[in-house]
């Protein structure tokens, strides 16, 4: 897949997820086969006001290319300025505009998926960012605002006309949030309506899902988010499936724990032990999903405060569950 001038080496893309796709997790996913990674979403206003924390979210790991920096906002001028700042700070190969986030505090400000209620404004923002950005621009969007306003096809054509180089389409409306089933038909319709690359997103939890969504929609790539939480090997598995090779099983629990520990150690190096451990309370638990008799250790994980706590818990898992 080629996005503007940027060559993406595989059809597998890691979706941006706030509080999840930090530098550490992106590095793990990249090593396991993700062809494109995207930062957590960053507020355009915060970048324009030189907020240090927001700028820190844009840090890429060495060799993390191609990579995309995602920004959100609803003011064309601020978004254009933020795109330039994000590209300069991160060294990202792409800038992604968030038009899909369904969270209330984002939508209430007119950002994220709220832009799907005003396609003309969304197109103006996209055009402003395209004209200002030194790198190609993409947009992540949803099927529509609700079942009464399914406008992904219309908006996708407007965004292409505005100069956007690729689209990622999630098959749910904002009203659905993450409930119900993703509608892949809309993604297929978007793919048929535009000439730029389309990434299919929604309900990709297995290698088989990745193959199915690509075949059904005709999309150029598959973007997965929640499906790889605790299972970054999904990229490895999906790549095998796409190549018609046997799908490798999930690694043994010992290896999964090693990967979880490494991810948390990388996060601690990047953002400090305290923040990394607070975030690890949910992240480590994801790696234990489906593991019999892991409840005791999940309870300990949500109470850990230091790296030493993490090492102690991991030793217990190795002793009792492996």
Pin down the residues of each PLM region:
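N-terminal small/glycine-rich loop or linker at the start of catalytic domains
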Residues: 1-13, 47-66, 101-111, 130-138, ...
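Active-site beta-loop-alpha junctions enriched in small/polar residues
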Residues: 17-19, 42-44, 72-74, 100-102, ...
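Hydrophobic faces of well-ordered beta-strands that scaffold small-molecule active sites
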Residues: 12-16, 37-39, 67-71, 95, ...
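Glycine-rich, positively charged N-terminal anion/phosphate-binding segment
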Residues: 2, 17-93
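Alpha/beta enzyme core
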Residues: 80-111, 119-196
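Alpha/beta catalytic cores of nucleotide-metabolism and tRNA/nucleoside-modifying enzymes
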Residues: 8, 12, 18, 23-24, ...
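Aromatic- and acidic-residue-enriched carbohydrate-binding clefts of CAZyme catalytic domains
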Residues: 116
């Amino acid at each position: 897949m080629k996005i503007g001038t940027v060559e993406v080496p595989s059809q597998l893309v890691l979706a941006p997820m706030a509080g999840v796709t930090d530098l550490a997790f992106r590095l793990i996913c990249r090593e396991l086969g993700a062809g494109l990674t995207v930062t957590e979403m960053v507020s355009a206003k915060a970048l324009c006001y030189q907020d240090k924390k927001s700028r820190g979210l844009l840090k890429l790991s060495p060799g993390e290319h191609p990579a995309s920096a995602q920004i959100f906002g609803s003011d064309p001028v601020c978004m254009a300025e933020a795109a330039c700042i994000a590209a300069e700070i991160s060294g990202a190969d792409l800038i992604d505009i968030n038009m899909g986030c369904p969270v209330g505090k984002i939508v209430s400000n007119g950002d994220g998926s709220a832009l799907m209620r005003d396609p003309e404004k969304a197109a103006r923002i996209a055009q402003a960012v395209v004209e200002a950005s030194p790198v190609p621009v993409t947009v992540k969007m949803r099927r529509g605002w609700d079942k009464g306003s399914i406008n992904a096809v219309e908006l996708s054509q407007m965004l292409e006309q505005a100069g956007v180089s690729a689209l990622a389409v999630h098959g749910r409306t904002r009203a659905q949030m993450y409930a119900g089933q993703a509608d892949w038909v809309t993604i297929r319709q978007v793919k048929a309506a535009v000439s730029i690359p389309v990434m299919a997103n929604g309900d990709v939890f297995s290698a088989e899902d990745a193959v199915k969504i690509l075949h059904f929609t005709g999309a150029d790539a598959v973007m997965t988010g929640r499906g790889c939480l605790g299972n970054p090997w999904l990229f490895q598995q999906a790549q095998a499936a796409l190549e018609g090779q046997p799908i490798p099983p999930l690694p043994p629990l010992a290896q999964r724990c090693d990967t979880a520990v490494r991810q948390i150690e990388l996060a601690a190096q990047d953002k400090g032990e305290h923040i990394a451990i607070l975030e690890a309370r949910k992240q480590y638990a994801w790696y234990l999903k489906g593991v019999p008799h892991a409840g005791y250790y999940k309870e300990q994980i949500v109470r850990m405060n230091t790296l030493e706590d993490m090492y102690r818990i991991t030793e217990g898992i190795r002793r009792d569950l492996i």
